[in-house]
């Protein structure tokens, strides 16, 4: 079994120790509150009167393993279909790789944050629940850009810097329409995708006749998109984000880092759960999933649950931590072993000074700063709140304010850091990474296979979405589709019984 004895996982943290508090985590270290949506470990919703499952030999029609946006969406769709549904979540909260928390009493998003109308699934939900939107100003509309090239720091008005960067982007993205003419249908131009999918983001960059300055700015951008070093990121992944943004750079800036939910991503989760009669059980890691032709048995440390179908809605990098019987397909096992590339750092930094709306670029490897990008979230009474990214968590401890201040000084000389805060998703045994970024070759080799059901076992998640993979939108896309598939499957089975 995977970690059923509290064994140490390959990243050095067991799931049992994580839940037991041996890993303090960023929230405790920074002295801030955890995510608002934290239900009791008993099944939320279990006190409601409900019709029993369709089959007499099971406890639930469907069990959803994983309580991120994909899992919650799938569970909502299943419960809407009249199916008795349980969500099992290993953490003590819902939300997956989204995490609404606080820094100095102010709301921050430690994981997934931004939404946009180019992301139709999440935008529909935001509008449906009447949630308000606010803006992050620094990335999409900076006044000043600071960049590192050849280990030298440059500074210029945004318009001047974007002339350099924009010309590089025009060259880099020139194949995007050929690869993804219909970006929500990733294999529509399958031959073109296959020809380019094996390239890394850095390999393609090195093919281009750009200046050193342009390549350094692009390296920063690629690292920020993929949350790792560019050689680990598939070139096709970079093209996908651009295609989904209507093949337009200003729209891409707005789509990936401008608009966010004013009340936090947690408020969208709360609304989705409230509209459903799903049951939710937290702090319940799943150890084993065993299926036969009649039902699925899910084993946790608390016992065994029987269901007619199971939705695996866990991050790709944790898929292999559950024991499956029969074992998963070779393709799923292979990519679960490889993992996706998203492994970087995201953090919030509060400084005393008002530095205005700034944006910084630095290649993932440089001698100046560990931050590939830093930009203004907003300027307030207590100074400026910045959002910072790094390709490698080994380069900077985002929760060490002194280290963060030292890393900022080459970019913003003299600033005083009063607090800094981030969450190491790599140490979290229920994520083992940040947002999903496919490695070279993984899209064409594994995406279709990841989406295939295996018997009574279905698979959902942002990590296997067709469109905005790695975003909240992709999670909702996948969860909705799989919820519909499972409902159709179960009702079809029942009607034919």
Swiss-Prot record:
Membrane-spanning ranges: none
In its keyword annotation, does this UniProt entry include Oxidoreductase? Answer: yes
Q: Which cofactor does it need?
A: FAD
Q: Which Gene3D superfamilies match?
A: 3.90.660.10, FAD/NAD(P)-binding domain (3.50.50.60), Guanine Nucleotide Dissociation Inhibitor, domain 1 (1.10.405.10)
Q: Which InterPro entries match?
A: Amino_oxidase, FAD/NAD-bd_sf, Flavin_amine_oxidase, Flavin_MAO, TAT_signal
Pfam families, per database record: Amino_oxidase
Q: Which EC numbers does the record give?
A: 1.4.2.3
How does its activity get regulated?
Answer: Strongly inhibited by Ag(+), Co(2+), Cu(2+) and Hg(2+).
Q: Which reaction does it catalyse?
A: pseudooxynicotine + 2 Fe(III)-[cytochrome c] + H2O = 4-oxo-4-(pyridin-3-yl)butanal + methylamine + 2 Fe(II)-[cytochrome c] + 2 H(+)
Any single GO molecular-function term of the entry would be: FAD binding
Pathway membership, UniProt: Alkaloid degradation; nicotine degradation
Q: How is the cofactor bound?
A: Binds 1 FAD per subunit.
Q: Which residues form the signal peptide?
A: 1-43
- How is activity modulated by pH? Optimum pH is 8.0.
Per the record, its GO cellular-component terms are: periplasmic space
Q: Which GO terms describe its biological process?
A: alkaloid metabolic process; nicotine catabolic process
Report the sequence similarity comment from the record: Belongs to the flavin monoamine oxidase family.
Q: What is this protein called?
A: Pseudooxynicotine dehydrogenase
Protein's organism: Pseudomonas sp
The gene name reads: pao
């Amino acid at each position: 079994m995977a970690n059923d004895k509290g064994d140490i996982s390959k990243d050095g943290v067991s799931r049992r120790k994580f839940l037991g508090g041996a890993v303090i985590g960023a929230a405790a270290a920074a002295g801030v509150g955890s995510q608002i949506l934290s239900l009791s470990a008993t099944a939320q919703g279990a006190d409601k009167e409900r019709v029993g499952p369709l089959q007499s030999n099971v406890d639930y029609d469907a069990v959803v393993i994983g309580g991120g946006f994909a899992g919650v969406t799938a569970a909502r769709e299943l419960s809407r279909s009249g199916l008795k549904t349980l969500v099992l979540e290993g953490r003590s909260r819902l939300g997956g790789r989204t995490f609404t928390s606080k820094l100095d009493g102010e709301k921050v998003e430690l994981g997934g944050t931004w939404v946009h109308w180019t992301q139709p699934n999440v935008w529909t939900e935001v509008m449906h629940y009447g949630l308000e939107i606010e803006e992050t100003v620094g990335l999409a509309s900076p006044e000043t850009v600071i960049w590192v090239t050849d280990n030298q720091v440059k500074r210029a008005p945004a318009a001047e810097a974007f002339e350099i960067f924009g010309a590089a982007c025009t060259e880099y993205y020139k194949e995007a329409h050929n690869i993804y003419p219909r970006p929500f249908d990733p294999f529509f131009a399958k031959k073109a995708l296959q020809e380019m999918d094996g390239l890394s983001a850095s390999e393609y960059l090195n093919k281009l006749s750009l200046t050193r300055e342009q390549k350094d700015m692009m390296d920063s951008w690629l690292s920020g998109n993929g949350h790792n070093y560019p050689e680990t990121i598939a070139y096709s992944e970079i093209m996908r984000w651009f295609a989904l943004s209507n093949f337009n750079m200003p729209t891409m800036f707005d789509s990936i880092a401008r608009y966010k939910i004013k009340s936090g991503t947690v408020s969208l989760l709360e609304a989705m759960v409230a509209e459903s009669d799903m049951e939710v059980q937290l702090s319940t890691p799943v150890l084993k999933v065993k299926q036969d032709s009649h039902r699925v048995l899910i084993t946790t440390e608390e016992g065994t649950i029987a269901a007619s179908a199971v939705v695996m809605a866990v991050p790709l990098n944790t898929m292999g931590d559950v024991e499956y019987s029969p074992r998963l397909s070779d393709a799923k096992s292979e990519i679960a072993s490889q993992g996706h590339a998203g492994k970087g750092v995201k953090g919030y930094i509060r400084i005393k000074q008002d530095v205005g709306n700034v944006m910084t670029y630095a290649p993932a490897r440089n001698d100046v700063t560990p931050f590939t990008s830093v930009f203004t979230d907003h300027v307030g009474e207590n100074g400026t709140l910045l959002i910072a990214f790094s390709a490698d968590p080994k380069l900077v401890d985002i929760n060490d304010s002194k280290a963060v201040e030292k890393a900022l000084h080459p970019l913003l000389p003299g600033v005083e850091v009063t607090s800094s805060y981030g969450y190491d998703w790599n140490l979290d045994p229920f994520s083992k990474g940040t947002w999903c970024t496919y490695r070279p070759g993984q899209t064409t080799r594994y995406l279709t296979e990841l989406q295939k059901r295996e018997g009574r076992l279905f698979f959902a998640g942002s990590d296997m979405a067709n469109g905005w993979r790695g975003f909240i939108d992709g999670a909702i896309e996948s969860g909705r589709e799989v919820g519909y598939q499972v409902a159709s499957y179960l009702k079809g089975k029942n009607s034919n019984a």
